[in-house]
C-alpha cells in the first residue's frame, strides 16, 4: 500500500513579495510546485496538497473594500474571500498538475472547496493574530489605521506591517470523507486551502460561515489526522528548522523526536506567527497517530522525502 503524504504549501511560496502579486506571477510559481509533486508521484506516494492564502486573501479583501467605498459595490465577507482564494489558487495548482500528469501518468488532480468547523466561542475571535495581505510601511499603516480604526496590524518578520484578523483553532474538516474517497479513486487532491472556510454550527445544526482565517498548518495537520496520512510535510522558507535562529550559535535540526522538539518549543526557539504554528501542528499530528513530519523548502521536498535533507520530526 502506498504511503499517504499531506503537503502544506505556503501562500508566500506563490506570492513571494509585493512585486509578484499578479495572477501571471502566481501561475509561474505554481508550476514549480507542480514539478515537485510530479517528482513525488514518481516515488509512488498518494498525495494531498493544502496551501496558504495569506497574501491572496488580504488582496481580495482589500479589493472588495476599495470597490465598496469608491463604487458602492457590495462588500465581500472575509469567509467568502477565503472561499474565492481556495477556488482561485486551487485552480492554478490543479491546472498545472493536470497539464503535467496528462503527459506523464494516469492520475488526475482535483480541488475540493473545504469548510472547517471552528468553535464560535474560540478566544481567537477576540484577539486577531493572523497576518494577511500586503506589507505596509509605517506611513501606509498609519494612513490605513486612521481610515479603519477597527483594523489591527502587526510588524511581520522585519518586512513591514500587515493587517491581522481572527484565527480560531480548527476542530473538524467537513469535507474530509470526500477527500479520502477521492484519494482512494487515485486523485491528487488539493483541499483545505487557506486553512479552510471557517464555519460554525448553528443551534439548528446548520453550518454558517464566520469571518476569520484559520492557520493553514493547523488545518493541514487536522486533515492529515482525519484522513489517516502517514507523513505530514510543511514547506517553509528554510531548508531546516533551526534553534538559536539568527544567532552565532544557530543550529539546524536534522532528526528530532517529539520530546526534544517540545523542549525546544518551551524554551522559546520558535517565534509565534512563523515557525511556532508549524511546530505545534507537527507535534499534534504525531501525538495523534502520524508517523513522521518533514519541514523544509518546496525545492528540497523530494530530497527530504528520500531522507537527504530537511528537518524530520519523529515519535521517538
From Swiss-Prot:
Q: Which GO terms describe its cellular component?
A: cytosol
Q: Which InterPro entries match?
A: AceGlu_kinase-like_sf, Asp/Glu/Uridylate_kinase, Carb_kinase
Which UniProt keywords are listed? Kinase, Transferase
Q: Which domain of life is it from?
A: Bacteria
User: Which biological process terms from the Gene Ontology are attached to this UniProt entry?
Assistant: arginine deiminase pathway
Molecular function as annotated in GO:
carbamate kinase activity
Q: Name one Pfam family in it.
A: AA_kinase
The UniProt similarity line reads:
Belongs to the carbamate kinase family.
Q: Tell me which NCBIfam families the record gives.
A: PRK12352.1
Q: What PANTHER family is this protein classified in?
A: CARBAMATE KINASE, CARBAMATE KINASE-RELATED
> Which protein, by its recorded name, is this?
Carbamate kinase-like protein YahI
Amino acid at each position: 500500500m502506498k504511503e499517504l503524504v499531506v503537503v502544506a504549501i505556503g501562500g508566500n511560496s506563490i506570492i513571494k513579495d509585493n512585486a509578484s502579486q499578479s495572477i501571471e506571477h502566481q501561475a509561474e510559481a505554481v508550476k514549480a510546485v507542480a514539478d515537485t509533486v510530479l517528482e513525488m508521484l514518481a516515488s509512488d506516494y498518494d498525495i494531498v496538497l493544502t496551501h496558504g492564502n495569506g497574501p491572496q486573501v488580504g488582496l481580495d479583501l482589500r479589493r472588495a473594500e476599495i470597490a465598496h467605498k469608491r463604487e458602492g459595490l457590495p462588500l465581500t465577507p472575509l469567509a467568502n474571500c477565503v472561499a474565492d482564494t481556495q477556488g482561485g489558487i486551487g485552480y492554478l495548482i490543479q491546472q498545472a498538475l493536470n497539464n503535467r500528469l496528462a503527459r506523464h501518468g494516469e492520475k488526475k488532480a482535483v480541488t475540493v472547496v473545504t469548510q472547517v468547523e471552528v468553535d464560535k466561542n474560540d478566544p481567537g475571535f477576540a484577539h486577531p493574530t493572523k497576518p494577511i495581505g500586503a506589507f505596509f510601511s509605517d506611513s501606509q499603516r498609519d494612513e490605513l489605521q486612521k481610515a479603519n480604526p477597527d483594523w489591527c496590524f502587526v510588524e511581520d518578520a522585519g518586512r513591514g506591517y500587515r493587517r491581522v484578523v481572527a484565527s480560531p483553532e480548527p476542530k473538524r474538516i467537513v469535507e474530509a470523507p470526500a477527500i479520502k474517497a477521492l484519494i482512494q479513486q487515485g486523485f491528487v487532491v488539493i483541499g483545505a486551502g487557506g486553512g479552510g472556510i471557517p464555519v460554525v454550527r448553528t443551534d439548528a445544526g446548520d453550518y454558517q460561515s464566520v469571518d476569520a482565517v484559520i492557520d493553514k498548518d493547523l488545518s493541514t495537520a487536522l486533515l492529515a489526522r482525519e484522513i489517516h496520512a502517514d507523513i505530514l510535510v510543511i514547506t517553509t522558507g528554510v531548508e531546516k528548522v533551526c534553534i538559536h535562529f539568527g544567532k552565532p550559535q544557530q543550529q539546524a535540526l536534522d532528526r528530532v523526536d517529539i520530546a526534544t522538539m517540545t523542549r525546544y518549543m518551551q524554551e522559546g526557539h520558535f517565534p509565534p506567527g512563523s515557525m511556532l504554528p508549524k511546530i505545534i501542528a507537527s507535534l499534534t499530528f504525531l501525538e495523534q497517530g502520524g508517523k513522521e513530519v518533514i519541514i523544509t523548502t518546496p525545492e528540497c521536498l523530494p530530497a527530504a522525502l528520500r531522507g537527504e535533507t530537511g528537518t524530520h520530526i519523529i515519535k521517538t
